[in-house]
């Protein structure tokens, strides 16, 4: 219970104590002092002082190991304080390095600060002369009309009351206005515990402040100082060394306590800690008073208070009191204050990832464990936002997947982590940076794939279109009967030779040069040329047509067509009747082209020499086949319409047949009704390669089979100028009347030499024969009977005269040579084969010179005539739209068939 009352009294005393006293605190150098060692070679200490304190006094760091002597430490100015924060805004950091070769777990280092010069003061105190009476309390003021009464009380019942009596005390009253200072305040003395302030003391309409204190009366045997004022007061002393403690005062309370106080400048007190040291007698040992309390005195000084106990005032009546800097120490153990050197950091790349590797300074004690802290961040981030990893006793770390095309920074630090050894983190290593490789993001790859896919699709589309166009152009360049412009009368249905009654009875089946038979040609059926097809080619001997057949077929198979025919014939004497004839090609004129039958795909139109037959008999022509075209015996033949040549009835029947010719490929008109074909003997006197074959022409019957013709081209045709020949046309001799010569090969019509033939602007199924000099017979368009041949007719048994290969106007028939599915004009030797072109303007006009005349080139003797390309030849054909044979001479009628 007594203890509780005592604690309550102390609490109330603390609350009622108006003075603000702070306990003794550490100075700023001691507060900021931090020391760490590497436990190998040195100790590093960091502390700070204030700029204001350095202007008055400098302090030095002192080190003491265990109980050894004090050793000053040299320190340098530093830029920062990484280990602690300075409580003052104007701190001056310092860094000290203390070499040390020995570190023991039991060693303890003591650090303190000492001023650069001696600082202190001394005082001798006599108790009777240093008496301070108690201060007044219960100060009250009351109003009495225009006066004010100030009252207070003093407690004299204490143990020292026998020293003091009311007669030894007096009271000093000080009052002032609120805005005035206490130095300017008025003073009133009173020997009682009250004082009266009247109007003469106070100013109207002002606020005053008063305070009272107790002091010894002048007649008292005691001396000392008055008690404290109710409120505290501050004043300045004379100037001097501002770093020295000032106004040291000690007062004995007359019982057992000697209270001492002193003042120190605030700037000095922040750096140097002063303590109160006293001696009860001069021979006694010096002791330090504690605790020391501080009190603020305005903005310049700080007052320190300390109470010295006086156990026996009678025995020890004189105390020696001094104020001097205290030696404050701080305990720092080396084994728990280790800071290692910063590691050295390197960045390495391992394939697609990155790794951090570091090395630390080797310590003397290898059993101490290490803990590493690694930080890495992007270049745009700060270290506070970085990623931190902590590893134990490791010297490398593999980084996770990093962002591409990004700069990264990394750093590392280390600290000890073994039991009994502790410290702080080392300084951060030097930050290392590196740039990651660039990688295309997924959305870019997706866009690239999309664009590539679109580009490939577009490329395939355009390539397909371009390839289709190239294919179309290539197909257009390929010769095709459907594209020919040789004839302009549309399609025509012609009757194959097999439908002719003259050859259907008493004749063996059609047999080709290879022994193949075509029984399908025995029937009679119409042929429509809707689609251009290659006409079949049958290699036949013209003599088989003109002579009666006898004996078996001994014609050998012809070899394949050579790619090029010699341009000149081989002249020779006429052969006997039993000599094997030259094998020739038989063609069907069943459309706007001359083509061979399908008996062979690549025939040799000139064939191979036929072995002699027994008894001189020859094979009869196959039924329904006309091997070559027989022309009149000479002279110029006028253009005869097909309908007129075949008769009105036949023409009507032909017109009723459906036209299947391709656009741009007109064919000859055909008359209806069968008629005996006009056949002529083959031309003799030529070798196998230069012997022309006859062109078969027949009037179709509804039952005759027809085959589409092939292209006409020539790789070996040689053109020579023929200025004297007039424009002629090849006219089919179809449907000749019965009053013509019964011979299988009609003769050539003769005429006067030099008579030019008429030039026709349009042709509707005509074949014009070459003119004979001096004659130019014509047949009116309305005359259905063609002109009669005037020249003698060759019999099948007669041998024609040889054709001179050097004749300027050789005579012969236009034959075709099949290569694959196309027909070409074979070479006719050195003789000219003139193709004349129609004039570009419609209507009759002068003839256009042949190609050799268009290109006037002088040819030296013995030099081969240059060959005209096939395309140029067919361009000439397309300009004229009909084939022109060279003129025949009258004196060589036997060379017609």
From Swiss-Prot:
Q: Which residues are glycosylated?
A: 58, 191, 346
Tell me the ranges covered by the Fibronectin type-III domain, including all copies: 133-240, 339-436
Give membrane topology per the record. Answer: Single-pass type I membrane protein
Keyword terms of this UniProt record = Disulfide bond, Glycoprotein, Membrane, Phosphoprotein, Receptor, Repeat, Signal, Transmembrane, Transmembrane helix
Q: Which CDD domains match?
A: FN3 (cd00063)
What SUPFAM superfamilies would the database entry show? Fibronectin type III
Question: What one GO molecular function would you report for this record?
Answer: cytokine receptor activity
**Cystine bridges:** 35-45, 75-96, 86-91, 250-260, 289-306
Q: Which InterPro entries match?
A: FN3_dom (IPR003961), FN3_sf (IPR036116), Hempt_rcpt_S_F1_CS (IPR003531), Ig-like_fold (IPR013783), IL3_rcpt_beta (IPR011365), IL3RB_N (IPR048668)
Q: Which residues lie on this side of the membrane: Cytoplasmic?
A: 461-897
Positions of region (Disordered): 498-517, 532-630, 648-812, 830-849
Kindly list the residue ranges recorded as spanning the membrane: 444-460
Where in this protein would one find the motif WSXWS motif, according to its record?
A: 425-429
The protein's matches in Pfam families, at most eight in alphabetical order, are given as: IL3Rb_N (PF21460)
| Biased composition regions of type Pro residues, renumbered to the chain | 564-574
Membrane topology, Extracellular segments: 17-443
Q: How does it assemble?
A: Heterodimer of an alpha and a beta subunit. The beta subunit is common to the IL3, IL5 and GM-CSF receptors. The signaling GM-CSF receptor complex is a dodecamer of two head-to-head hexamers of two alpha, two beta, and two ligand subunits. Interacts with TMEM102; this interaction occurs preferentially in the absence of CSF2. Interacts with FCER1G; this interaction is direct. Interacts with LYN. Interacts with JAK1.
Of which family is this protein a member?
A: Belongs to the type I cytokine receptor family. Type 4 subfamily.
The linked condition is: Pulmonary surfactant metabolism dysfunction 5: A rare lung disorder due to impaired surfactant homeostasis. It is characterized by alveolar filling with floccular material that stains positive using the periodic acid-Schiff method and is derived from surfactant phospholipids and protein components. Excessive lipoproteins accumulation in the alveoli results in severe respiratory distress.
Please explain the role this protein plays, according to its UniProt record. Answer: Cell surface receptor that plays a role in immune response and controls the production and differentiation of hematopoietic progenitor cells into lineage-restricted cells. Acts by forming an heterodimeric receptor through interaction with different partners such as IL3RA, IL5RA or CSF2RA. In turn, participates in various signaling pathways including interleukin-3, interleukin-5 and granulocyte-macrophage colony-stimulating factor/CSF2 pathways.
Q: What is the protein name given in its UniProt record?
A: Cytokine receptor common subunit beta
Q: Which organism is it from?
A: Homo sapiens (Human)
Q: What is the lineage of its organism?
A: Eukaryota, Metazoa, Chordata, Craniata, Vertebrata
